[in-house]
Amino acid sequence: MPKILDSHSHYLPPEVAQHTAFFKVNWSDIERHLTLMDQNGIERSVLLYPTSDAHIQMGGWQKLCDVYNLEISKIVKKYHDRFIGGGILPVDQPQNFKKELQRMEDLGLRILSLAYSYEGKYLDDPIFDPVFEFAGRTGMPVHVHPQIMNPIGEERLRDPLLTPVLEYVFDVSACIGKMMMSGTFLKHPDVKFIFAHYGGVLPFVKERFDNTYQMLRKRNFVKDLTKDPSEYFKNLYFDISGSKSAASLMCALEVVDPGHILFGSDFPANQNLAAIIAVIDGAPLSAAEKSAIFANNFPQLLAL
């Protein structure tokens, strides 16, 4: 059984889960999480915020941060050799970002857990510049997760199946595209961005990005990005987010090399961890490349 580090899993403290519409059941069972980790050879897991509606019922993002970040830090301290904590920010109060970032450091949280968008505001918005400056300065990775609250296209689809299946992956691709077009990646070259779900539809439109950019650039219809879009994508990291599709993995490898793909279970949304592991085990990759995806890439991001 390979050594595995899980870069994408979830735990919602009961104090938060009780204020959500969806996450009340199965999202607060840390013992179940540990059992599945042991059964599947997962040494450590990163705990990320799944995005929820808790901030609405709890009276705002700051109150959510007060509870969530503290409770995640307690789990990390209790199981310090098994879990790595990701902290969240009061996105509706950017004036509090600096204070909350310092609090995250003081609590021992090692990763910034952000969403692709917040009520239509993407991470290319200037309010996030101080966050990325902090991440670049401290080396804290930024994990970017799907947004369940009003993702792209929500006003058109409004469907309990189509929203998580289609809108989530379109939202991440829109986020990456907007960050590229706004110059966010150029402005913050030292930030280690990790995007969930292979970057959404990005692997499928990589060639279209380059070809269309080159065509439009010749006619001066698009600004000079200094390099093809695919060159930006090579510097990003993508986690597999519980995917059991070998085709998706191979498609992602056309965008980035194995050194930029991370194992991620997306537990408890996905509980068949063995099937996820089998996809990487069965891929036409070298033993070293498989080990990189399973375990060796992530410690380099965190200096573990």
Task: Label every model-predicted segment.
Residues V169-D171, H188-D190, F221-N272:
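Active-site-adjacent C-terminal substructures of enzyme catalytic domains
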Residues H10-S28, N150-V172, N211-N235:
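Active-site gating loops and adjacent loop-to-helix segments of metal-dependent hydrolytic enzymes
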Residues P2-R44, K74, K99-R103, V191-K192, ...:
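Mid-to-C-terminal alpha-helical segments outside catalytic/metal-binding sites
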Residues E43, Y49-I176:
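Active-site gating/metal-coordination segments in enzymes
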Residues L5-S9, S45-L47, I84-G87, L112-L114, ...:
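Hydrophobic faces of well-ordered beta-strands that scaffold small-molecule active sites
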Residues H10, S117, Q147-I148, G199, ...:
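Catalytic metal-binding/acid-base residues of hydrolase active sites
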Residues G183, P189-E231:
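Aromatic-lined glycan-binding groove of carbohydrate-active enzymes
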